[in-house]
Amino acid sequence: MRLWNRFSRLGNLLCACAACGCSFTPWRCSSSPLLSSFSAYNMSSGNRVTSSVGGSSGATEVCPSHTPLSSSTLLRYTIAPSEPTMGSPWQTSEESASRRLAALTSYPPSNIRNVAVVAHVDHGKTTLSDVLLRRTGVLKGSVNAGAYTDRLLVERERGITVKSQTCSMFLKYGGSEFLLNLIDTPGHVDFQYEVSRSVRAAQAVLLLVDVAQGIEAQTMSHFHMALDQGLAIIPVFTKMDCVLNDTTVDAALQQLEDSTGLLRSEVVFTSAKEQLGVEALLQAIIERVPSPSGAIGLSDVCQLPPLLPGSTARVAMEAEMVPLRAILLDSWTRECGGGLYRPPSKTSSALSGNVKIDEDKDTVTCLVSVIDGTLTARTNILLYHSQKRYEAREVGVIHPELRPTGALTVGMVGYVVFTRVQREDFSVGETLYTLPTRKFTRGGIAPVPGFRRVHPVVFAGFYPDEGEYVTQLREAVEKLRMNDPAVTVEPLECQALGSGLQLGFLGVLHMQIFQERLLSEFGQRVLVTPPVVQYKYREAAGGDDQPPKPLSVHTWRWLHEGVSCYMEPHVTATVVTPSEYAQIIDGEAQRHYRGKQLDMRVMDDARVLLRYKMPLADMVRGFFTFVKSQSHGYASLEYDELVYEEADLVRVDIVVQKARISALAVICPRHEAPSVGKRIVASLKSNLTRTAVDIPLQALVGSKVVARETVRAYRKDVTAKIHAGDISRKQKKWNDQKKGKERMARRTVGGVTLDQSVLAAAMGATAL
């Protein structure tokens, strides 16, 4: 009875027993009753709750006192969709898409809802978004046809969401038609920046929680982000079809209240797999998501009707014009748009003013959210920070592909196409604005608050397969950075690998996804060096008040070169794991990954929370992979902002045939230098091709050799033709051979050729 009363939109319902006529609550019967089935309609929303046991299909409802007991039977709870009624509170709009798009400007802000879907990894965001799109008629076909919002090839191959995707939906509710912009976001911690950008276009978030897994690390991260931005939060429990008993649901509800302070009465229960609870969720979005606000009006003289200059009507309309203000959320080119691209050679539709767009390689499509004013084709748009001016060639919404419309007004999220642009002008977070008349100036325009600058967590060198292709690689990286602005780029030179780029990422998975997108979208095969973290140092002359400076293998300075101390990034890592794996993970974290345990807490009967202070380098080196593999994917790992602490660091240089290989240099703690150097030279020894002379391999810390191996030379049997005689004849041949090899070695100092396969194997050894 206690749990039933607290379920959102289910009500306080009792069933009449068919045997004795008493009243009883069917939900609280997980311990014994073998109810054939029960169904009860929510008096407020029309949802029907269904419970079935053991596959029985009877229709009689009896109280627990008239049913046999069975401790081995567990109830399965689902929320079924409402039966169709004439007075349904809302229904999907049946008009054609063209009519709705043509009338898009007639939607007042009060009839617009912008909502983002956020959750931990694998809590059902993409699947639920796909079901909502199909329920509102945007997509056709079964849900099993594939997740629509995962457009990129790498997303479909890996089964994870990498890019946020937006889609506009139309639905009727209470006699009014609403425009709903749904934003599906990634769940992995490496793409947190993508989430923070996407929610800027929303007034609320759907905070999804897998009812079986409960509150996870990223759930709390998204919750605090929504609070910081002042967004409304609608908690949604997913995968209700997997619930075996009410204890699981009750525990998840209690955890939600304790962790977030959200009331369990606010929770919406859904099952995307069974398409249940979808109508209740849509109703909650309409009723509980705030509508956007902003100044309404035309924003450019091109939007005015053809009136004589100076006429009374024109003067009156110009007086009512308001400057456009919009924020740039994302941008992409033809190659990296995931299919969201309209060839600019085609003529825009009548809705966009029949603007002829010329084919141009510098065409950019931007996703924008309109704060004030109106955005149409031919609008002269100014970029606030770059101070450049461009003309909008086409505007529209994503429904589910790029659909041109007459305009984008206050509260709408849509796209705008620009041609002949400088791609570096369109930075994410840029404010787009207009000055419709002379009374408006740039000083009077308040820029939309941009996004916080993100700092890379790991760095890696990207080198093309062939050195002469570095220009193509740089072009591909710049195009992809428009769609993934969290990546930083610096030029890089290596004696062994040639010219390349040093890229900064938010995590190892982020790096892997970027590499795969370079191959799938641009055909760029690259050699990637092992990821390294950003170290820092403090100058001795500057004192403790001077901020530390970045340090890498390329900018390394020793203590005698004016360095006061080195600093290493540390994080607080939080692991939520099934209890059976907690002991193994805890032991490995402290033994092999320099983790210092801060907390160990039992969350419930099945899960344990572990918290460590750990160097970021050790987490990158393999702790995340170890946790996932050891727990078979059931554990989650989250870490907070970086904190730099003093550390005893050294640079390990690898010398092959007296030549330093900069691509294999690595920074590590002093006590780990011998083992790191030994792994690298051992890998080189096993992969290098033998030659006619010995190849010495050394690992150096400064001038001190901490590890050494030798690739032995092939030896020709120079005494093969000497079958008799004194031993001195053979010794003379051996001495001549030794002197000849010494002369060859002097001529080939630093001349050993290292194939990329050899370097890749050695680089992999640095990450072990």
Swiss-Prot record:
Which keywords belong to this entry?
Answer: GTP-binding, Hydrolase, Membrane, Mitochondrion, Mitochondrion inner membrane, Nucleotide-binding, Protein biosynthesis, Transit peptide
- The UniProt record lists the EC number as 3.6.5.-
Nucleotide-binding among keywords: yes
Which GO terms are recorded in the biological process aspect for this UniProt protein? Answer: positive regulation of translation; translation
Q: How does it sit in the membrane?
A: Peripheral membrane protein
* Residue span, tr-type G domain: 110-293
Localisation per UniProt entry: Mitochondrion inner membrane
Q: Which InterPro entries match?
A: EF-4, EFG_III/V, EFG_V-like, LepA_C_sf, LepA_CTD, LepA_IV, P-loop_NTPase, Small_GTP-bd
**Per the record's keyword annotation, is Protein biosynthesis included, yes or no?**
yes
Its UniProt entry gives the catalysed reaction(s) as: GTP + H2O = GDP + phosphate + H(+)
Q: What class of enzyme is it?
A: hydrolase
**Pfam families, per the entry:** EFG_C, GTP_EFTU, LepA_C
Which residues, by range, are in coiled-coil regions?
none
One Gene Ontology term, aspect cellular component: mitochondrial inner membrane
Entry GO MF terms: GTP binding; GTPase activity; mitochondrial ribosome binding
Question: Mainly resides where?
Answer: mitochondrion
| Positions annotated to bind GTP | 119-126, 184-188, 238-241
Transit peptide located at 1-29
Give the protein's biological function.
Promotes mitochondrial protein synthesis. May act as a fidelity factor of the translation reaction, by catalyzing a one-codon backward translocation of tRNAs on improperly translocated ribosomes. Binds to mitochondrial ribosomes in a GTP-dependent manner.
Which protein family is named in the record?
Belongs to the TRAFAC class translation factor GTPase superfamily. Classic translation factor GTPase family. LepA subfamily.
Its protein name is Translation factor GUF1 homolog, mitochondrial
